[in-house]
Each structure stands twice: as structure tokens, then as C-alpha cells.
Amino acid sequence: MGADMQPDYARLPEVDQQSCDGFVSSEFLPTRRDRRKGILYLVWFVFGVASGALLLKMLQDLPLLMTLDSSEAKLQSLLWMPTEIVVFQPNDLFASIPSPTSDRAWDELLGPSRGFVNFENPEEELGLPPGRPVPDDPKSAVYGISMFHQLHCLIMIREIYYGILLGEYNTTMFHVEMDNADGGADKDNHEHEHDRSGKAFKIKHTKHCFDYLQQSIRCAGLMQVEMPQGPDRNIFDGYGSPHVCKRWDITVFMEEHRVIEE
């Protein structure tokens, strides 16, 4: 750019020092660092007030917490189990048709306890309603654990399902047994109630299992995200996805409270 194109600048007029006497000196103006400190102090103040309010609320609720039934707290503590992350993977053993090996695998899920536990002084110590009496031990009672009840139901449904497919239950037999299980015309129906190995009892119990399992699944309400599988990502089988699961310390608990059959 040529010299003749240079812009002209005019000198600003000098300011009379006395005209600035009404302004605050810059040494008294807050710096950026001071403003940061002020914001930090404000944050800590708000945090302190919130913490104090929370502490006060806890102290106010303390009498209520202390009056909480200690037996209920003891029961919750007794039943608490640690969790772990488990990635579900296919298990052909449990997906296979009945065989001595697969049947044994399913049966072993119930363990020696078969899903029942024995508690001493359950009504006084744990706040439980009366359980099944234990012979020769009036202070103890037997209760069931829901996870094993659910497994028992799956085992029962599996038996009926494959029994129908393999011809152990023919269609006519199935409908007759279903009528009997519903309280049909069979006059010996009440006797079937006591035959827990009979087909009538198993069919009736399986009907109960469908209802019990749907309630159990909805009660657990697991909200863990499952990723799609397959080349087109359109298969949702639950495999390959992490799930938060109870650790199998449960088996130790069941053994410690195992019902000893005489």
C-alpha cells in the first residue's frame, strides 16, 4: 500500500487528572483472580448449606431409623448378596433335550437344599410369619427362597414341554389331566393333589409356574441393555451382553441354612 494511502490519525486530547477524581482507583477494582475466588467461595457456601441441610434432615430422621424394626433390618442383612458383571453366553447343556447329563445339570441348580432354608427363631429374630414346623425343633422353621422356586418352575415346565414333544404326554391324556387339575369330573382329583409325582399334579403346578414366573420377572424388572447380534444386528437373544448378577455366594448361604431331612 502506497504512502499516500496511509490513514490519518489524530491525537486524543489529554484528560485532566482532576476530572478523574470521582472514579475509583484501579487498585480497588476486582481482578479476574478475585472474581474466580468469589465464585469459588460462593460454590463452597452453597455446598456447605446443602450439606448442612442434608445432615440436619438425617439427624431429624435418625429417631425414625432407630425405631425401624431391627428384625427386618437383620433379615435384609442376612439375605444381602454381592453382585458381579456376567456376560451371557450360549450354554448348550441347558438348551439340549432331556438326557441323563442335561437332566442332572438342571437338577444340580437346585443344590442339596432344593431351595429350602431353616431359620432359628425366625419370628422373633427376623420378623417372619410362621414357617413350616421342623420336627423336634420348635424354635426353627422352614422357608423357601424365590430364586430356587423359579428354577424349580423352569424344571417343571421343561419336563412337561419335552414330555409332550417326546410323546410321554399324548393329547388326550393332556386334556384329561388338565381337566382333572382344574377340578374336573375325576372323583379322585383330590388324591392326585397328594401325588406330587403324578401327571395331574405336574400339569396343575406348571399352570401355577407360568403365573409365578411372569410375576417374578416383572418384580425383578431388570433394565439392563442387551445388544443386538448377527451380521444385520437384528437378533436380540441376550447373549454377549453384560448383566449385573448376584454372585453364587447364594449357594454358601443355602448350605449354611440347609434343611436337614431326618
From Swiss-Prot:
Keyword Transmembrane: yes
EC numbers: 1.-.-.-
Location within or outside the cell: Membrane
GO molecular function list: oxidoreductase activity
GO cellular component: membrane
A Gene Ontology biological process term: mycotoxin biosynthetic process
Glycosylation sites: 170
Keywords, ordered alphabetically: Glycoprotein, Membrane, Oxidoreductase, Transmembrane, Transmembrane helix, Virulence
Pathway: Mycotoxin biosynthesis
Key word Zinc-finger present: no
Membrane topology of the entry: Single-pass membrane protein
Phenotype of the disrupted gene, per the record: Abolishes the formation of phomopsin A and leads to the accumulation of a deoxy derivative of phomopsin A.
Residue positions of motif HXXHC 2: 205-209
Principal subcellular localisation of the protein: membrane
Motif mapping: HXXHC 1: 149-153
Main enzyme class: oxidoreductase
Swiss-Prot/TrEMBL domain comment: The 2 HXXHC motifs are conserved in ustYa family proteins and might form active sites.
PANTHER family xrefs: TAT PATHWAY SIGNAL SEQUENCE (PTHR33365:SF11), YALI0B05434P (PTHR33365)
Function: UstYa family oxidase; part of the gene cluster that mediates the biosynthesis of the phomopsins, a group of hexapeptide mycotoxins which infects lupins and causes lupinosis disease in livestock. Within the pathway, phomYa catalyzes the hydroxylation of C-beta of Tyr. The pathway starts with the processing of the precursor phomA by several endopeptidases including kexin proteases as well as the cluster-specific S41 family peptidase phomP1 and the oligopeptidase phomG to produce 10 identical copies of the hexapeptide Tyr-Val-Ile-Pro-Ile-Asp.
Family: Belongs to the ustYa family.
Name this polypeptide is given: UstYa family oxidase phomYa
Source organism (scientific name): Diaporthe leptostromiformis
Gene behind this protein: phomYa
